[in-house]
Curated annotation (Swiss-Prot):
Listed SMART domains: Ribosomal_S4, S4
Organism: Triticum aestivum (Wheat)
Main location: plastid
Presence of the UniProt keyword Transmembrane in the record: no
Subunit and interaction comment: Part of the 30S ribosomal subunit. Contacts protein S5. The interaction surface between S4 and S5 is involved in control of translational fidelity.
Protein name: Small ribosomal subunit protein uS4c
Keywords of this entry: Chloroplast, Plastid, Ribonucleoprotein, Ribosomal protein, RNA-binding, rRNA-binding
InterPro entries (UniProt xref): Ribosomal_uS4, Ribosomal_uS4_bac-type, Ribosomal_uS4_CS, Ribosomal_uS4_N, S4_RNA-bd, S4_RNA-bd_sf
PANTHER family: 30S 40S RIBOSOMAL PROTEIN, SMALL RIBOSOMAL SUBUNIT PROTEIN US4M
Gene Ontology cellular-component terms listed: chloroplast; small ribosomal subunit
Function: One of the primary rRNA binding proteins, it binds directly to 16S rRNA where it nucleates assembly of the body of the 30S subunit.
Domain (S4 RNA-binding) ranges: 89-157
Length: 201
């Protein structure tokens, strides 16, 4: 299944706020409040909805998300929490959380177009996994810095998660540590996502 490129408002009406996909938020009284049949179909719908929220927020294909679930399942810690950590430490998401892009798709474009460096080296892979003490910067030219300047200036420092830091004058971000669960940028029940995939096998 390919990455979603359709109407974003349609998705947030169905799934709720997806800050990684769009800054828009669903209006009250949207499709989220529709009534559904109880029982197994309702439980399946809830698990599917949580899985879709995760996929569209981080801009993943179904195959990519499934691969992350498999990796997380091999860890000795909670599969759900490891899954969220893997997704949150992606370079495109780190740029988004630093405020260097307004959405994850926007951050992905910065990476694809070779505007971003990690520890002084160009990285053009959005799924690149960042780690503690990584330094994220733009290329040292006017065009690259101009692409993130407005986003950094308009970002709210109070919303910066504790595992990240940013120097707004140098356009430089720092990964301090692996994030804690409470700093995940999406309202999600990751256990339902893991349960969804466990029932598919």
């Amino acid at each position: 299944m390919s990455r979603y490129r359709g109407p974003r408002l349609k998705k947030i009406r169905r799934l709720g706020a997806l800050p990684g996909l769009t800054r828009k938020t669903p209006k009250s009284g949207s499709n989220l409040k529709k009534k559904f049949n109880s029982g197994k179909k309702e439980q399946y719908r809830i698990r599917l909805q949580e899985k879709q929220k995760l996929r569209f927020h981080y801009g993943l294909t179904e195959r990519q998300l499934l691969r992350y679930v498999h990796i997380a399942g091999k860890a000795k810690r909670s599969t759900g929490q490891v899954l969220l950590q893997l997704l949150e430490m992606r370079l495109d998401n780190i740029l988004f959380r630093l405020g260097m892009a307004s959405t994850i798709p926007g951050a992905r474009q910065l990476v694809n177009h070779r505007h971003i460096l990690v520890n002084g080296r160009i990285v053009n892979i959005p799924s690149f996994r960042c780690k503690p003490r990584d330094i994220i910067t733009t290329k040292d030219n006017q065009r690259s810095k101009g692409l993130v300047q407005n986003y950094i200036a308009s970002s709210d420092p109070g919303k910066l998660p504790k595992h990240l830091a940013i120097d707004t004058l140098e356009y430089k971000g720092l990964v301090n540590k692996i994030l804690d669960r409470k700093w995940v940028g999406l309202k999600i029940n990751e256990l339902l996502v893991v349960e969804y995939y466990s029932r598919q096998t």
